[in-house]
Amino acid sequence: KKSGYDSYYKEQGMNAPISKEAEAAYTTALNSLLGKDSSNKYRLHDTSVVFWSQKPTKLEQCFCFIFTSPPKDDPDKNTEVIRDFLKSPFSGVLNDEDKTPFYVLGLSPNAARISVRFWRQGTVGEFASHIRQHFKDLEIIKSKNQRAYFSLFNLLTQVASLNKMENLPPCLASDLSQSIWDNQPYPTTLQMQCLIRIKADRNITSIRAAILKAYLNRKFRNHNNPPKEIQMALDLENKNQAYLCG
């Protein structure tokens, strides 16, 4: 109020009025994205996420499967979609040079209103490249009966008490998603939750090991003098004392 952003004596909620035509356009579009039959939305803990590209793209088709739990009638669906997504640059289906605009919007209930939890915009190529880096960071040796790839849902349930999403810290799911899209270090809360579950359950699963490996590599990657990155298998050439001590 009474700031340099006020215009034409309009204050607070009336500072940026929009036309009826604009209101009708964005509410119609949002209702369509949030509709019951929409494939451009998914639920992330307490946040509804909607996404779209300026024109139909492969990323738009598989984006939901990368971040959600697999369908009950097809538990391997997510793994298949992620595998195709990671191979897409080599098949020419989806490449990192695609300049098609891509958007992600996170909405959360707030009293009687809806609040914007996060907003991301970039190109299909940028989002695809950052998501592939995320999966590369998570690579680890697994047994034959384990899934080849971990969706965001798999990661979050592995660090949650009783493997239930509702037991996670409020902002972890959205913070982790944004770190993936921006190709930034994972939130510290992810590491803390992972260590807590390992200590409580006395069980280091391959997913939890992958989370800690990826967290450390992403954390130190942008340092001026980063240490040698942790590999997906035992590195016999690594002489770092902390690494040798486990």
Model regions and ranges:
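Extended alpha-helical scaffolding segments
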Residues: K2-G246
